[in-house]
């Protein structure tokens, strides 16, 4: 009678251990999948933010002045009044 109780106890412990191991394995896999999803989401967020910044930088860059254009700034030493008047006439 004693041996039947010991065998039953051993088999019960084995089944409980296998069940606990399967539960732990499933929760570990689920945690890994969720972590991978979160990392992918944060990576995409950072890519979107860097793309927004790059777009704003390209949109807000001032146009480069052409060196062939006459100097139309009144404060500079190379100011050309004739070119300035011609430019005003074109705009009017």
UniProtKB/Swiss-Prot annotation:
Which UniProt keywords are present, listed alphabetically? ATP synthesis, CF(0), Hydrogen ion transport, Ion transport, Membrane, Mitochondrion, Mitochondrion inner membrane, Transport
Q: Report the Pfam families cross-referenced here.
A: ATP-synt_E
Q: Where in the cell is it found?
A: Mitochondrion inner membrane
Superkingdom classification of source? Eukaryota
Gene Ontology biological process terms, A to Z? proton motive force-driven mitochondrial ATP synthesis
Q: Which GO terms describe its cellular component?
A: matrix side of mitochondrial inner membrane; proton-transporting ATP synthase complex
Provide the membrane topology annotation: Peripheral membrane protein
Principal localisation: mitochondrion
Which InterPro entries is this protein grouped with?
ATP_synth_F0_esu_mt
- Report the GO molecular function annotations: proton transmembrane transporter activity; structural molecule activity
Describe, as the record does, how this protein assembles with itself and its partners.
Answer: F-type ATPases have 2 components, CF(1) - the catalytic core - and CF(0) - the membrane proton channel.
Q: What does this protein do?
A: Mitochondrial membrane ATP synthase (F(1)F(0) ATP synthase or Complex V) produces ATP from ADP in the presence of a proton gradient across the membrane which is generated by electron transport complexes of the respiratory chain. F-type ATPases consist of two structural domains, F(1) - containing the extramembraneous catalytic core, and F(0) - containing the membrane proton channel, linked together by a central stalk and a peripheral stalk. During catalysis, ATP synthesis in the catalytic domain of F(1) is coupled via a rotary mechanism of the central stalk subunits to proton translocation.
What is stated as this protein's family in its record? Belongs to the ATPase e subunit family.
Protein name, UniProt field: ATP synthase subunit e, mitochondrial
